Structure formats: C-alpha cells, structure tokens
Amino acid sequence: MRGCLQSVRWLTTALRRPAPQLSCLPFQPFASTSRLFSSCASRAATAARKPPSELEQRIAAIPIERFRNFCIVAHVDHGKSTLSDRLLELTGTIEPGSNKQVLDKLDVERERGITVKAQTCTMLYNYKGEDYLLHLVDTPGHVDFRAEVSRSYASCGGALLLVDASQGVQAQTVANFYLAFAQGLELVPVINKVDLPSADPDRALDQMKSSFELDVEQAVLVSAKTGLNVKQLLPTIVEQIPAPVGDHTKPLRVLLVDSWYDTYKGVILLIRVFDGEIKAGDQVVSFATGKKYIVGEVGIMYPNQTPQTVLRAGQVGYVYFNPGMKQSQEAKIGDTYTKVGSEKLVEPLPGFEEPKAMVFVAAYPVNSDDFPHLEESINQLLLNDRSITVKKESSEALGGGFRLGFLGTLHCSVFQDRLQQEHGANIIITPPSVPCKILWKSGEETVITSPIDFPDDDSSRMKVEEFQEPYVLTTLTFPQEYLGKVIELCEGNRGEQVSLEFFTATQVILKYQLPLAQLVDDFFGKLKGLTKGYASLDYEESGWRKSNIVKLKLLVNKVPVDAVSRVVHTSQVARLGRQWVTKFKEHVDRQMFEIVIQAAVGNKIVARESVKPFRKDVLAKLHASDVTRRRKLLEKQKEGRKRLQAVGNVIIEHKAFQAFLSK
C-alpha cells in the first residue's frame, strides 16, 4: 500500500514539472519553409563543428600550389589499378599488401580484372620537407567506358600515360592519348611490366615517341607488380604535373564529376572545387535544375569516405546533402553548383557530352513472377550508371521485360553480371542489336531501337524512303604477320578501309569503316582468335549510312516469336536464317503434332526445319490381315493430327529460349 502511495506522489510531482524544451522540434505545419530550411542548415553546421583531425590539419596547411590532380591513362589490362595500389602504399594511404585493386570496388571488376567505374583517392606525399596533396583517378581502359574517362580528365591537370612494355602502344592507348591531349593535360610517359621476360621497353618508348611525339627522356620504367622504380614516379608527378588553378576567396564554383547511390545517405556527389570553399551547412543551388540543397557532409576519398570540415579550391572530394538527394536524376553529370545568392556572380562550367546508347538488348525474367524483382534490381543499378536507357517491353513468348540500351557489348555484359551477382536476378537476354534510322517519304525521321517496331509488312514499307544504319570508325593495332587475315575479316564484315600505317617494323595500325551491327556481332572475339590475342580495337561514331536492312523473324507453326526477331543486312539473311532454325530445333520438345520452324523476311520463307511428332501405334491390337481396318485407323489418326495442329499451342519452355539466345 505504501509503495502505491509513493508511486502516486511521484507521478503527481512529475506532472507538475514544466515540460522540457526539446532541441529538435517535431514537424510544425504552420512554420515557414525558410525557417525550416535555415534550422536544418544550422543543425548541419553545428554537427560539423568537430575538432579537426591530424589529417585535416596537414591538408589545411597545404596551399593550392602544392596540389596535384592526375589520372592514369592506358589500354585495358596494362596495369593501371596495380600501379594505383603501389602509389597508395608508398604514400601510406593503405597498408602494403593489404588489398589488391583497392580502387576496383565492384565484384565484377575484381572478377574480370578490369576497371568499369572511375575511382578516386587522395594521398599525402612529403617531398623535400613539404607536404603535397595528390589526387589520383583510376580510369577504365575499355572503349565502352570512354565517357567515364573523359569525365575524369575534367578533374585533372595531368596524366600518367601507361604502356605495357611487352605489348607496346595499343588502340585504346592512342584513343585515350588524344582525349587527354585535347583537354590540355600534361602527359608523363610510363612504361610498365618491365620485369616480364617478353618486355621490350626500347620498342615501347620508340612507339610513344613516333606516335605521340612525347619526350621519352623523361619516361619512368616501372614494374607495378613488384614495385620496381615506382618510388621515382612520385617526384616526377610533383615536378611535371601542374597545380590546379583556383581561388578559395572567390564565390563557390564546383563541378559535378560523378555520383553514386548510398542506401542511407541518398545520392553522393563526386565534385571538383574550382573556386571558393564548401562545408557542411552551406546552402547550394544547381545551375541545371535550379534546386537548392543543404550540405550535410563533405570529405575526401582516403581511400574510403573520410569526412572533412571543408573542401577548398583545387580539391576533389565528395559531398552529400541533408536532407539527402533521393532521385539520382537530379544529379546531372557536368552540372555546376554554387552557394545560394551567388548565382549571378558565377559563370557555369562547360558540362560533358551525354553518352549515347549504341547497343540494345531485351531482358526478361526466367520466371514471369520475378518481374517486380527484376524491375527493382535494374532501378538500383541505374542509380550508379545512368548511361543505360530503359524501356518496358512485352513479348507474347516471354512476357514482360525491358529494352535496355548500353554503350557497348562489354558494358552490357558487365551489367548482366552485376544483376546476377548483386541482386540474384535470373534473366533471359536477347542478342545485342543496334538502332536504325527510317527516312519516310513524308520527310520525317524515326530512330528505332527494337526490332518489334521495324516496319516489315508491304503497306508500311511502301511509305519508307530509305533505311540507315550506324557506322563506326575502328582503329585496330596488331602484329604485321596477321595483316592479311585481319583485312579479310574486315572485308567480310562489310568494312571499308580508311588507312593502313606501319608505326614500327612489326606493328600495324589499320583503320576501317564498319557497320556497328557487325562490330557487336562478336567481331572482337573473332579478331582476337585470328591474331592469337595480340590485336586491340578502338572505335568512335561515324554517322549514319544508307543500308539494305530487313527484319528477320522466327516462326513456330506460322506464329512469329517476337522475342527472337532481329534487323539484319540482306547479305546475312540466308546464313542467319539457317542457323536460327537449326539451333531452335535442338531446344524444342516434341509434341503430339508436327512443329514447323521457319525463318522469314516479310512473307518470304528463307529457311525451314520441322520437329516430328510422337507416334502412337494405333495398329498394335489389329490382326495383320485386317487391311481395311488398318487403313481406316491410320486415316483417322492423320485427321486428328491435322485438327490438333490447327488448334494446339506449341509449348516452348523458357529454358529453350535461354539456351537458344545464349552464344
């Protein structure tokens, strides 16, 4: 009883006390937007007021004259990521031998040994008693990710031009050199893999001198794998690569270089600060969208996200907003940001050219019930890669799916791997196709990306003036001994020779105009096979050309299978049609009636195969001499099969489509 009375007294006393003043108030419906905006900004600024770390104090003491922003540029598999690891180890950013390919963060990058996303890292290097702030960008080498490379150059003042001592200058070395040269980057020649038995550094240096007119006397010969001579690179970077230009006293001007999505923080932006300073609590505005944001956190990649109090002019780092940017479409690559109120004082920076999808595939879930999961998985990956185009599509054979556009075939393959590895999506992918342009007699133009939309009936084709397909200018480098075979391959793929150059006694640079449709049809695989893996390839868009293209369809019992249709050149129709019907026959189960598989262009059948039906022995119980009864039963069975074929649906398992569409 006494305990109950004490509880009542305690409760009465508590109720008489004044309510505590809460520091963080709940949502007030009558509060003005500006009050809420300023209160969020003040809270973010208060949260950012922490004592600076030793790293921050060292960075704060470094003037912009001792900043160096650089990237590593090379052909695929010439050792960019391995060299990045050695530089990070030498500057104390990571522990020696702690990780391989630190900047290759995706599983597919580690598995394939390639770089897909450009990654950044900040390093501190003490040279002659003074600290230098080095900012490294590890760029992709493959042509499909050219947009990643060109964006990376915008945040750099120089580049290490890396060449494999055993392979020499390759096609993408040439392409990436011209990209860097056009942006005015200071180039430092570096020869890698000098420890290999097949290494020939002198030949590689001669190629760099003759191809790029670089001063090879300043070249550094290294082995990124063993660490040989890598220490000599750091003084070379400090002495040869210029400091960034910027003024931290001017109004804020930052360039959005890249972005990625974080589940908890929303969209995180990778920025290059050209002028001014940016810190948590600042209110910034986008020139592209006009939307305003409050900076929640700024920091550098060291090599992971490391928060900082402020980012100054010349630095490259990350920023995310509070409240977070939830729609990745708001983060437009190449956009300029400044502080609210400084819009008229700042000239926006020139942006980047938007990458265009050049290769299209259709993706369908193996199980139609998994469509929502596939859609969610694709949307998650799009947050980190907005160069992919997505359009919903429906197929009678495979159900709901998506028409996806990519920068190239490797880009498509990497996306498929990420869907399966990171999201467990089990999908059916159609062979890659390219867009085509239709010029109508009415004067209109239409670009179609799906074979389903291609006009193949007579009435539609009568309205067409001409069809066009995209061409690319390809640059191939390979040993001279394979010249005849490579020319034969290019000519067999409707190519037109542009130039032929012997840039050393044994190496050839061959340029061809090729239809993009031929290039995506495993051209690179055939090229590698012909040259025993010694060839390299690079390409760039070369416009549209008139072409005699048609839509090739697959018919099963006279019903078109829309998921398998494809736009091809007339010279390929007979060969491809024969391949289709032969391969599809292997994967279709027998039915109670005959299945006719045909390849057709319009109303013309170009190839045919048939799957024989199961046969029931209706004569088993008859006497051998009963000829009349025997004939009657056989005729009845024949009529029954005709009726079944007329009304029966051919059941084709999804596994059959998956096997047929695979290489």
Curated annotation (Swiss-Prot):
GO terms for cellular component: mitochondrial inner membrane; mitochondrial matrix. Residues 65-245 form the tr-type G domain. CDD domains: EF4_II (cd03699), LepA (cd01890), lepA_C (cd03709). Pfam families: EFG_C, GTP_EFTU, GTP_EFTU_D2, LepA_C. The keyword Mitochondrion applies. One of its GO terms (biological process) is translation. The keyword Protein biosynthesis applies. Residues 1-44 form a transit peptide. It is a peripheral membrane protein. Promotes mitochondrial protein synthesis. May act as a fidelity factor of the translation reaction, by catalyzing a one-codon backward translocation of tRNAs on improperly translocated ribosomes. Binds to mitochondrial ribosomes in a GTP-dependent manner. This is Translation factor GUF1, mitochondrial. It comes from Coccidioides posadasii (strain C735) (Valley fever fungus). The lineage of its organism: Eukaryota, Fungi, Dikarya, Ascomycota, Pezizomycotina.
